[in-house]
From Swiss-Prot:
A motif (Nuclear export signal) lies at residues 77-85. The gene is E7. Gene3D superfamilies: 3.30.160.330. The E7 terminal domain is an intrinsically disordered domain, whose flexibility and conformational transitions confer target adaptability to the oncoprotein. It allows adaptation to a variety of protein targets and exposes the PEST degradation sequence that regulates its turnover in the cell. The lineage of its organism: Viruses, Monodnaviria, Shotokuvirae, Cossaviricota, Papovaviricetes. A zinc finger (unnamed) spans 59-95. Residues 1-41 are annotated as: E7 terminal domain. It comes from Human papillomavirus 58. Plays a role in viral genome replication by driving entry of quiescent cells into the cell cycle. Stimulation of progression from G1 to S phase allows the virus to efficiently use the cellular DNA replicating machinery to achieve viral genome replication. E7 protein has both transforming and trans-activating activities. Induces the disassembly of the E2F1 transcription factor from RB1, with subsequent transcriptional activation of E2F1-regulated S-phase genes. Interferes with host histone deacetylation mediated by HDAC1 and HDAC2, leading to transcription activation. Belongs to the papillomaviridae E7 protein family. One of its GO terms (cellular component) is host cell nucleus. One of its GO terms (biological process) is DNA-templated transcription. This is Protein E7.
Amino acid sequence: MRGNNPTLREYILDLHPEPTDLFCYEQLCDSSDEDEIGLDGPDGQAQPATANYYIVTCCYTCGTTVRLCINSTTTDVRTLQQLLMGTCTIVCPSCAQQ
């Protein structure tokens, strides 16, 4: 605004929307490439899918927060959950040294 009284001309912009190409240029891998990655284990069995899981719990001894990151299958995470619900506990590094 340049004057004491604003005018409509000062608020109208000269911008116009530009068309955007929404086509995805991503190329999928050939299925023959998956065989080279090693999806099959040494015994010919397919490897189970793994993922990162973050575990936040308290130290059994002092109660401080302990954070773990594991890479496992869902079945093994359930097994770990059952162990932690039982007698298996996690302690922090400072309590582990004592």
